[in-house]
Swiss-Prot record:
GO terms for biological process: proteolysis. It comes from Rattus norvegicus (Rat). Disulfide bonds join C233-C259, C285-C312, C355-C386, C474-C486, C481-C499, C493-C508, C549-C561, C556-C575, C569-C584, C621-C637, C720-C786, C752-C765, C776-C806. The record marks G255, Q256 as: Cleavage. This is Transmembrane protease serine 7.
Length: 833
């Protein structure tokens, strides 16, 4: 309290009426009247002295004022403390990790020792330069510090400096910190000369290679591991012998596991890491994984110069990776080890390889040799390049290339994810798949260049080469598939996908079946398919009689085979061991049969397998329940680093109106098909594991839909339903709050291919050719549900994938064909077997 305001001797001008106190005292008798002064008679009496008023600054008032002062002081102190805590809590730290190459300073061995005078001096110099860059930038008031973590040699000469940058700012302003913005400040500070046509510029006296500058957001845990005093499970290896294998082994049975292995080889050589086995029970591929980096700090795979490969599943298959420089970082993370986690691996120093050759093809109409990606059978590193020249012995012969689990197609405007091929001045993109293809070049002289991806390490490639007759690519009596394979003409239009791309089953003339012929009775595609095609029904007779097993027969658990198609979970026991009806507790019949364009509001409980997937709280995609823990959706919903992280995702089950789900669970794990192609939407399928299994008490509102049997046969014109909360019309700006349903029909595959041209055997079309009913934005990943007539169960025939617009005439929706992925689903969800 201000002392001047409480002092009774303050000036009268400061007094207020409220400062005056009146004391009323009760006394007996009448109040004395005021006496008039008398004139003195004789000697005057002495006048009485007035009573002294009690002073204001007495002991009692002092105690009161002191108590008030203490109270105000306590309130003020508490308020200031709360404001400080609140201000501190509302600020976030942002971590960025990067590196650049200094070209005008030679590497010293002492730089490997972080306690050495040489390292500390160099680190101080670089930190001062980085400090000056950011303290004079637009982010100066948020900049906190920079820390040099490593100074290493590299195959291009000079020093490779790895560093961290830390910013601190209010949480509300965190959105302004984009990777591009922070990196641009550093790059713009490098002064380059127009006359100097190299990538080297000047940064505060340091000669820095512009092309080497890499900077992106990092994790706080990685920062703490890199600069903390307790490095825990971290090791630095320097390898200088070419013939040695340096072991890397780590294991843990409990607790937290966070290990960093920094591998450095002698200048001019590369590192090959070979992983023999890894044991890891991953919650997701972000927090639980083994990751390989082409640097000494964990810089993500999105960086141009760096590669990263993440493993988050147990494996005992040997895998090896090659660096692009003389260094590599291996990290193993698991925040909570339940059983056993660890790796057994080794690394070695290898020389750089040139990938080029000139080959004279001598054989005629056969494959005579092999070429491969660099460092085969290792994953080949980013930015690699190969050149091959082929020459045939005759001008009538061309070059045939047989790719294993790979295909090349003409390059589009979208670019190439897995590098590009230039073949006789024509550009192609490569993509991985689950079958072989043949690519033919009708020229006796062929120049081929493979330019590897600039960002990714890719699976090894093995290509057989040979010659072929340009005028007759396939032998007489054979059909040439779109995949390049040649199959016997007799296998065309037989109902079996012999070409792997269904090209042998397209544009087939539908004729009345010759029911009485022996060929039809034994091998016809309409035999035992569940549809009666012959008037007497003979095509559906004796379908469960035991016959020798082929690729067209159904196989029971005891290896007995028969002709019946779609026998799995059809409600009829066909196998003696009942294996065809095991694990079939899915999809009760919907009681109602009355992103969806042209659809109507469904009724609650109609589609109990429908799921809404929310990303950061907003509806983003659909999915289908296939078990108590697993969902099935589309891979394109999770494309990219941000969307592939399960942390922001939640699954809303048993929901009719958006926001009113009966059960909500975080997503524990996202498994995207390894061959997914974001350019063509091939292999557009993904599995999601829930963190919490939905309870059995909600089975009336949540139920799994049945997975189709392998190679399920469907017929065009069959009625199915597409459901979702997507847009009702293409022009709508947001989705529907109520679950929509629309009846569609399966479209003939030939019509589908004729419409879009890029349809693979892993896709199917459904819709209404008039355009009245279709899926739309927001329905992606949702189910295409078809009801089986034999038992009334619902089958997940398709997954909403892509299409041209929404509900446009003559452009049906394209769906992922689930029956082609049943073995892949069983690999992760064996309980469905």
């Amino acid at each position: 309290m201000d002392k001047e305001k409480s002092d009774p001797s303050c000036k009268s001008s400061d007094l207020k009426i409220s400062n005056i106190s009146i004391q009323v005292v009760s006394v007996p008798g009448k109040l004395p009247g005021r006496r008039l002064p008398r004139k003195p008679i004789g000697k005057a009496r002495p006048r009485k002295q007035p009573k002294k008023r009690a002073p204001f600054w007495n002991v009692q008032n002092k105690i009161i004022l002191f108590t008030v002062f203490l109270f105000i002081l306590a309130v003020t102190a508490w308020t200031l403390l709360w404001l400080y805590i609140s201000k501190t809590d509302s600020k976030d730290a942002f971590y960025f990790v990067g590196m650049f190459r200094i070209t005008n300073i030679e590497f010293l061995p002492e730089y490997r020792q972080k306690e050495s005078r040489e390292f500390l001096s160099m680190a101080k110099t670089v930190q001062q330069v980085v400090n000056l860059v950011y303290t004079t930038s637009a982010f100066s008031k948020f900049y906190k510090q920079s820390v040099v973590a490593d100074v290493s040699s590299n195959n291009k000469g000079g020093l490779l400096v790895h560093f961290w940058i830390v910013f601190v700012m209010p949480h509300a302003k965190g959105h302004i910190f984009c990777e591009e913005c922070v990196a641009a400040i550093l790059k713009d500070s490098i002064q380059t000369s127009i006359t100097n046509r190299t990538s080297v510029g000047t940064l505060q006296g340091l000669a820095v290679d512009m092309d080497s500058v890499v900077l992106n957001a990092g994790l706080r845990s990685d920062y703490s591991s890199a600069v903390g005093s307790d490095n825990g499970c971290s090791q630095y290896f320097y390898a200088d012998h070419l013939t040695l294998r340096y072991p890397l082994e780590i294991s843990a049975t409990s607790g937290q596991l966070m290990c960093h292995f920094k591998l450095v080889a002698i200048v001019g050589y590369l590192i090959r890491l070979s992983i023999e086995s890894i044991q890891l029970e991953a919650d997701n591929c972000i927090t639980d994984s083994l990751t390989v980096y082409d640097s000494l700090l964990p810089i993500r795979i999105t960086c141009v110069l760096l590669s990263g490969y993440r493993i988050c599943e147990p494996t005992r298959t040997l895998m090896s990776f090659v660096s692009t420089n003389n260094l590599m970082l291996v990290t193993l993370k698991s925040p909570y080890v339940r059983r056993l986690a660890g790796i057994r691996a080794y690394f070695e120093v290898i020389p750089e390889q040139k990938c080029e050759n000139t080959i004279l093809v001598k054989e005629i109409n056969s494959f005579e040799g092999k070429i491969s990606s660099p460092y085969y059978p290792s994953y080949y590193p980013p930015k690699c390049k190969c050149n091959w020249t082929f020459q045939t012995s005759l001008s009538t012969l061309g070059i045939a290339l047989k790719f294993h689990n790979y295909s090349i197609t003409k390059k589009s405007m979208k670019g190439c994810e897995h590098g590009w091929w230039e073949i006789n001045e024509h550009m192609y993109c490569g993509s991985y798949m689950d079958h072989e293809t043949i690519f033919r070049v009708p020229s006796p002289l062929v120049h081929i260049q493979l330019q590897c991806s600039s960002r990714l390490s890719d699976k090894p490639l093995l290509v057989e080469y040979g010659s072929y007759n340009i005028s007759q690519p396939c032998p007489a009596g054979s059909f040439r598939c779109s995949s390049g394979l040649c199959v016997p003409q007799a296998q065309r239009c037989d109902g079996v996908n012999d070409c792997f791309d269904e090209s042998d089953e397209l544009f087939c003339v539908t004729a009345k079946p010759a029911c009485n012929t022996s060929i039809f009775r034994q091998h016809g595609p309409l035999v035992c398919d569940g549809f009666q095609d012959c008037e007497d029904g003979q095509d559906e007779q004796n379908c469960t009689r035991s016959i020798p097993c082929t690729n067209r027969t159904f196989k029971c658990g005891n290896d007995i085979c028969f002709r019946k198609q779609n026998a799995q979970c059809d409600g009829i026991v066909d196998c003696p061991d009942r294996s065809d009806e095991e694990g079939c507790g899915c999809s009760r019949s919907s009681p109602f049969l009355h992103r969806v364009v042209g659809g109507s509001d469904s009724q609650e409980g109609t589609w109990p397998w429908q799921v809404s997937l929310h990303f950061v709280g907003s509806a983003h995609c659909g999915a289908s329940v296939i078990s108590r823990e697993w969902l099935l959706s589309a891979a394109h919903c999770f494309h990219g680093n941000r969307l592939s992280d399960p942390t922001p995702w939640t699954a809303h089950l048993g929901m009719y109106v958006q926001g009113n789900a009966k059960f909500v669970s975080p997503v524990r794990r996202i498994v995207v098909h390894e061959y997914y192609n974001s350019q063509t939407f091939d292999y557009d399928i993904a599995l999601l594991q829930l963190s919490i299994a939905w309870p059995e008490t909600l089975r009336q509102l949540i139920q799994p839909i049945c997975i189709p049997p392998v190679g399920q046969r469907v017929r065009s014109g069959e009625k199915c339903w597409v459901t979702g909360w997507g847009r009702r019309h293409e022009a709508d700006s947001k989705g529907s709050p109520i679950l929509q349903q629309a009846e569609v029909e399966l479209i003939d595959q030939t019509v589908c291919v004729s419409t879009y041209g890029i349809i693979t055997s892993r896709m199917l079309c459904a819709g209404v050719m008039s355009g009245k009913s279709d899926a739309c934005k927001g329905d992606s990943g949702g189910p295409l549900s078809c009801r089986r007539k034999s038992d009334g169960k619902w089958i997940l025939t398709g997954i909403v994938s892509w299409g041209y617009g929404c509900g446009r005439p003559n452009f049906p929706g394209v769906y992922t064909r689930v029956s082609n992925f049943v073995p892949w689903i069983h690999k992760y969800v064996p309980s469905l077997l």
